């Protein structure tokens, strides 16, 4: 996992260069939003269970997926879906705090699509639930922090598409 600082420094180091204006501006932007990201992470942590509950209700609860024969039918499958959504919320929050999505590649996306396909997990429904989680989280955090967090939910959805 990298953070925005490590990413900028590693890029310059590989090129054998000092940080240029563009690199320094990236760091300034990262530091300028630090308090916003920390407050957002605290709000998400305090409300994670409700975020998941509202997201499931909004996207999945009353769809065919939860009815007999659907992929979330049976308590075990439903619980696995809830567990996965909680995992995505937590890792997206880590990425937002770091200012870098690499943790999502390393711990979520690498091999996930293939795993879901092999298990018969409907990717479309997963993306729909993540989009609902983005909406719920954005409503809770407000515009600025919601937009920041949305980048990481969108990154997960893009990786699953």
Swiss-Prot record:
The principal localisation class reads plastid
Gene3D superfamilies in the cross-refs? Phycocyanins
Q: Which UniProt keywords apply?
A: Antenna complex, Bile pigment, Chloroplast, Chromophore, Electron transport, Membrane, Methylation, Photosynthesis, Phycobilisome, Plastid, Thylakoid, Transport
Topology of this chain in the membrane: Peripheral membrane protein
- Give the location in the cell: Plastid, Chloroplast thylakoid membrane
Q: Which CDD domains match?
A: APC_beta (cd12126)
The UniProt record gives the binding positions of (2R,3E)-phycocyanobilin as 81
List each coiled-coil range.
none
InterPro entries per UniProt: Allophycocyanin_b (IPR006245), Globin-like_sf (IPR009050), Phycobilisome_asu/bsu (IPR012128), Phycobilisome_asu/bsu_sf (IPR038719)
Q: Which GO terms describe its cellular component?
A: chloroplast thylakoid membrane; phycobilisome
What are the disulfide bonds? none
Q: Which GO annotations describe the biological process of this protein?
A: photosynthesis
PANTHER family xref list: ALLOPHYCOCYANIN BETA CHAIN, PHYCOBILISOME 32.1 KDA LINKER POLYPEPTIDE, PHYCOCYANIN-ASSOCIATED, ROD 2-RELATED
Belongs to which family?
Belongs to the phycobiliprotein family.
Q: What does the UniProt function comment say about this protein?
A: Light-harvesting photosynthetic bile pigment-protein from the phycobiliprotein complex. Allophycocyanin has a maximum absorption at approximately 650 nanometers.
What is the protein name given in its UniProt record? Allophycocyanin beta chain
Organism of origin is Aglaothamnion neglectum
Q: What is the lineage of its organism?
A: Eukaryota, Rhodophyta, Florideophyceae, Rhodymeniophycidae, Ceramiales
Gene behind this protein? apcB
């Amino acid at each position: 996992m990298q953070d925005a600082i490590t990413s900028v420094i590693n890029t310059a180091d590989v090129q054998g260069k000092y940080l240029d204006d563009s690199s320094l501006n990236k760091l300034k932007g990262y530091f300028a939003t630090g308090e916003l990201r920390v407050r957002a992470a605290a709000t998400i942590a305090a409300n994670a269970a409700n975020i998941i509950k509202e997201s499931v209700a909004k996207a999945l609860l009353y769809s065919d997926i939860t009815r007999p024969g659907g992929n979330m039918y049976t308590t075990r499958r439903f619980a696995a879906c809830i567990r996965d959504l909680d995992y995505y919320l937590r890792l997206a929050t880590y990425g937002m705090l770091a200012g870098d999505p690499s943790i999502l590649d390393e711990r979520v996306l690498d091999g996930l699509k293939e795993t879901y396909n092999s298990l018969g997990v409907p990717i479309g429904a997963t993306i729909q639930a993540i989009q609902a989680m983005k909406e719920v989280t954005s409503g809770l955090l407000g515009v600025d922090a919601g937009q920041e967090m949305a980048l990481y939910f969108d990154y997960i959805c893009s990786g699953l598409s």
